[in-house]
């Protein structure tokens, strides 16, 4: 009987956990500086180079990280050609800094998602390192 009760409790806990693809629209935008940079500051309109890792939000994961969907290095202009939350997340960073950014669907890919890797209504977690402002 105790075994059955334990199985039921465990099943209830697992069922209540967020999956990496569960819509998570109630999670707010937030940033956490993991390392504060000492170089020039990124402002809207700055051309920046960043290293990044991206995960789907999962409330049961370490640091709310679920499935990693992307990683790399790229250059862009803050406020142009990237999702709004990514631009907002890098604004105010200084070169050499690393920031964890939580992006709700409204500032990310919304109800459309992106390809096969980011489902509709996904909250995203990025860790971004500001490499340079050329």
Regions found by a protein language model. Give the residues of each.
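Cross-family detector of peptidyl-prolyl cis-trans isomerase
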Residues: 2-134
């Amino acid at each position: 009987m105790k075994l059955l009760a334990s199985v039921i409790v465990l099943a209830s806990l697992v069922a209540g956990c967020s999956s990496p693809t569960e819509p998570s629209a109630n999670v707010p935008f937030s940033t956490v500086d993991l390392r504060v940079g000492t170089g020039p500051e990124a402002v809207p309109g700055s051309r920046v180079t960043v290293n990044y890792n991206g995960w789907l939000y999962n409330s049961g994961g370490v640091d709310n990280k679920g499935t990693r969907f992307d990683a790399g290095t790229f250059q862009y202009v803050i406020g142009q050609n990237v999702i709004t939350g990514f631009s907002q997340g890098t604004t105010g960073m200084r070169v050499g800094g690393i920031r964890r950014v939580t992006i709700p669907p409204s500032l990310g890919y919304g109800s459309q998602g992106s390809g096969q890797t980011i489902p509709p209504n996904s909250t995203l977690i990025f860790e971004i390192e500001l490499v340079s402002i050329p």
